């Protein structure tokens, strides 16, 4: 992180107050804002454009693996949710409930009337309502596998909200599949986890750990839950996506049955998997700096911005014509399988002001063009992965020919930077005392100062006792983020001395 004494566009800096820095970046980058509805946010065009690119890429990945999109009701009858006991217990405290079906004007006010015979739950997730449809759609083994994805919004009441990370309403995709056999369903679960990991690393430049959740962190009603976990710059973990093997639990609750090849009636094996707009929060906290957002080129709404520098009215037409031609040339190039996204900022503002706006938005490449640059047949280029004042003159032809390689170079640099940061703050720990010391924050200078950044990922042996896990969470606010899928050496639990099959990832988290 940068020296807090240096002049930056965002204050406080990450080192001074990471939580406040995060909110200031969202504001400065014009990503989102709070709404009048408690716990909900307005996603502004720049933030929504990021989500649209996430959707576009993931949708292609899903369809390439045989999945199709559908849409299911926002409202779930209470009786459906009650069919899966563990599921309803896990979500009960977060559910928004609709109890009336209309409003009536009384004494100048609107009053809810017409109580529903059965309350409706605003979907917190859709396993039960989709399961009802699957029960109608699946009759024979020939109907399987059933591979469905839904792009939707969900509502989960949150007491402590933070934009993009935890909001009462958020956008996501949720995949739901049904299979004839247990191995097929497990393969699907792991395939989708792999797709999430590939998307995170290749498109978001976000290094992740793939692993399984412990019993206490498992999705309500699932047999096994898998996840991808990433480290943010404050060294906390963020769960970036989950994939659940549901066994036959939801199939039995919803009545998803089919006749197999022998004519025997049996329950299907199901999965579900999801990823949400919290990925934008992950992007901010992984790549952002003290000057604002840093967008990975592959997902940036605009990959290149051209900023005309016009100090005299008489050169305006010449500079804009040159910039317009450059824009067309750059858009004719391709990067990551699509035309390069280029924006010409022709607003009547000072060049420096425009440049700083695009720095704060995180646009990967900035090109400043004035009369002198035109005379030289060049542009003045700045990269968002470097300091704002690190700019260089680049010949126009060289820039156009190499823009795809330049964007990939920035993408690779962001991924490598994130990997280096994670490696620097991942520690192998063998004793309880060392573990507690690692996650105990250093003292603050003043009583109301924010907690200093500390800790990271701890790789420690754990025998799996839920009571031990709960005690550590209570003491330190630390949880098992996942049991890594990679093979590990057996050892001794750092907390109980009992045998442990492998090390697990511990961290404080969002």
Swiss-Prot record:
Localisation per UniProt entry: Cytoplasm
GO molecular function (one): ATP binding
One cellular-component annotation, GO: aminoacyl-tRNA synthetase multienzyme complex
Key words of the record: Aminoacyl-tRNA synthetase, ATP-binding, Cytoplasm, Ligase, Nucleotide-binding, Protein biosynthesis
Protein name: Proline--tRNA ligase 2
Native organism taxonomy: Bacteria, Pseudomonadati, Myxococcota, Myxococcia, Myxococcales
Sections of the chain in a coiled coil: none
Domain of life: Bacteria
EC class name: ligase
ATP-binding keyword on record: yes
Residue stretches spanning the membrane: none
């Amino acid at each position: 992180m940068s020296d807090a004494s240096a002049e930056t566009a965002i204050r406080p800096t990450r080192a001074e107050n990471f939580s406040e820095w995060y909110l200031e970046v969202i504001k400065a980058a014009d990503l989102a804002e709070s709404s009048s509805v408690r716990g909900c946010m307005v996603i502004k065009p720049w933030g929504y454009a990021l989500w649209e690119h996430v959707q576009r890429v993931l949708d292609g990945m899903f369809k390439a693996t045989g999945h199709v999109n559908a849409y299911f009701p926002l409202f779930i009858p209470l009786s459906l949710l009650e069919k899966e006991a563990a599921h309803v217990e896990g979500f009960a405290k977060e559910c928004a409930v609709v109890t009336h079906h209309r409003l009536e004007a009384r004494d100048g006010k609107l009053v809810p009337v017409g109580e529903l015979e059965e309350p409706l739950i605003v979907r917190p997730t859709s396993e039960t309502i989709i399961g009802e449809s699957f029960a109608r759609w699946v009759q024979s083994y020939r109907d399987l596998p059933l591979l469905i994805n839904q792009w939707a919004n969900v509502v989960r009441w949150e007491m402590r909200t933070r934009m993009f990370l935890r909001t009462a309403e958020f956008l996501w995709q949720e995949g739901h599949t049904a299979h004839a056999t247990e191995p097929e369903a497990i393969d699907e679960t792991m395939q989708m986890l792999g797709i999430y990991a590939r998307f995170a690393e290749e498109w978001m430049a976000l290094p992740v750990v793939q692993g399984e959740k412990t019993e206490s962190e498992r999705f309500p009603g699932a047999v096994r839950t898998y996840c991808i976990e990433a480290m943010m710059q404050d060294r906390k973990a963020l769960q970036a996506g989950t994939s659940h093997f549901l066994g036959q639990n939801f199939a039995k609750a919803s009545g998803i049955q089919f006749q197999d090849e022998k004519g025997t009636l049996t329950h299907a094996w199901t999965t579900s998997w999801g990823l949400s707009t919290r990925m934008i929060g992950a992007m901010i906290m992984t790549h952002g700096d003290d000057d604002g957002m840093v967008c990975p080129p592959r997902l940036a709404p605009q990959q290149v911005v051209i900023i005309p520098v016009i100090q005299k009215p008489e050169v305006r037409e010449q500079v804009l014509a040159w910039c317009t031609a450059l824009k067309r040339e750059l858009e004719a190039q391709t990067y990551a399988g699509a035309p390069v996204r280029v924006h010409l900022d022709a607003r009547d503002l000072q060049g420096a002001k425009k440049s700083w706006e695009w720095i704060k938005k995180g646009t990967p490449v900035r090109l400043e063009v004035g009369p002198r640059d035109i005379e030289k047949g060049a542009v003045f280029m700045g990269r968002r992965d470097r300091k704002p004042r690190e700019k260089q003159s680049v010949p126009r032809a060289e820039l156009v020919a190499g823009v795809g390689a330049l964007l990939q170079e920035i993408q690779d640099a962001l991924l490598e930077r994130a990997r280096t940061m994670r490696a620097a703050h991942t520690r192998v720990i063998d004793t309880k005392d060392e573990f507690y010391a690692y996650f105990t924050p250093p003292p603050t200078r003043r009583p109301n100062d924010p907690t200093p950044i500390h800790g990271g990922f701890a790789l420690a042996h754990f025998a799996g006792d839920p009571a031990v896990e709960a005690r550590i969470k209570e003491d330190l606010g630390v949880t098992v983020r996942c049991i890594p899928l990679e093979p590990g050496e057996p050892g001794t639990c750092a907390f109980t001395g009992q045998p442990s099959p492998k090390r697990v990832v511990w961290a404080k988290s969002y």
